[in-house]
Every structure is written in C-alpha cells, then in structure tokens.
C-alpha cells in the first residue's frame, strides 16, 4: 500500500497590473512546457490521478491530489516539485517583476507530517491546513 499524502499547490500571478499578469503567466507556461523537468506536468496522463488545472482566465495553475504516494523518487512527483522550483526561481529573481506567488501543502498520514512551502505575495486562503475532528454521530 505505501505511505499516502494529500497534496495541493497553486501558482498565481498577482501583480497589480493585469496586463503584466497575463504576459508573465504565458511566459511562465511557455518556459514550463519547454523544460524537460516540468513538461510532463501538462500531459493528460498525469491528470488521471489528480486535478491539475491551468486557469488562463485567472492566470494561475492549481493542483490537488488526495491519498497519493508522494515519493521524491517518482517521476510525476519530481515534475511537480520542479514546477514549484521554477516558481521559486521566478519569485527570487530580483530583476523579474512577474508578480508570481505560490503555496504548496502536503499532509501525510502521520499527525505531525505537514510540509508547507510558499513564496511571493501569497494569500493564506489559497491553500492551507485546517484541523478538525471527525465523528460518527
């Protein structure tokens, strides 16, 4: 069976100038699709076990998968990690005025296994962890 995780991330362009968002978004998409490490994220086969949406109207990429084996040795996981690394590179480039922001959250089966990464001017409501109690009554 293996260890399972729930995973979600979003990459967004949130510059005040919407024209800048559009240009940056499509430049980022072109770079990601041309890069061997990230291109597979955009293949239809990769979407069979997860939700991967390129939202052109809102200049964002959203990903969500429940109960998956999120092992760093898996090619599909490496692709998504590479896409997040590309977003981080864009965010950390001082000459880049793209307005990129991203948030990644992975929750493992163990209660203390939570991984979070973020960058840019992100909003807490995009992706976050909420604790709750389930009951059968």
Predicted regions and their residues:
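Short, extreme N-terminal segment that most often corresponds to the first beta-strand
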Residues: 1-31
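Charged interaction segments
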Residues: 30-137
